């Protein structure tokens, strides 16, 4: 139950695409390139785990972390980047054959869903830059 002066805020987005512009992976082929956009943070779905880890560890939100370049609270309050504009720009310039939204399941659960049957993706781990906030949470929640 919520207190009388509390409120719950929620939102959602609905997308629409013309059928000829649907991206369905049917044209994927060996040798295609994987492009990636960097993560800006935990985003909305990740905050349940963030709260759990930092609550259990009684993290000080006002503490400054050199690796973050700011306090933990400032880092956690940074607004989520909305990727629609950079994605639309790529769609204008490149023949995109698949798109994968990397969520809680990470690469292993999300990328295969966007691949054509029989195709695989090779991701070089050393080319993936993980934000410092992710490393801090992993270290804190170990």
How should each PLM-predicted stretch be described?
Residues 23, 54, 112-114:
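Ubiquitous "structural anchor" signal
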Residues 12, 42-43, 54, 107, ...:
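Phenylalanine-focused residue identity feature
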Residues 28-74:
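Acidic, glycine-rich loop-and-beta core segments that form the ion-binding/anion-interacting portion
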Residues 1-48:
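Glycine-rich anion-binding loops of enzyme active sites
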Residues 2-9, 60-61, 65-77, 81-142:
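Glycine-/charge-enriched secondary-structure boundary and capping motifs
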């Amino acid at each position: 139950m919520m207190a009388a002066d509390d409120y719950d805020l929620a939102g959602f987005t609905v997308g629409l695409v013309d059928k000829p512009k649907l991206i369905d992976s049917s044209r994927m082929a060996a040798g295609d390139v994987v492009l990636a956009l960097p993560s800006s943070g935990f985003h909305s779905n990740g905050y349940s785990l963030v709260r759990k880890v930092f609550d259990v560890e009684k993290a000080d939100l006002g503490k400054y972390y050199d690796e973050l370049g700011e306090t933990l609270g400032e880092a956690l309050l940074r607004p989520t980047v909305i990727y629609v504009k950079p994605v639309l720009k790529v769609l204008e310039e490149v023949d995109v054959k698949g798109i994968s939204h990397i969520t809680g399941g990470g690469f292993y659960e999300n990328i295969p869903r966007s691949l054509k049957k029989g195709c695989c993706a090779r991701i070089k781990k050393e080319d993936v830059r993980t934000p410092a906030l992710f490393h801090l949470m992993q270290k804190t929640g170990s």
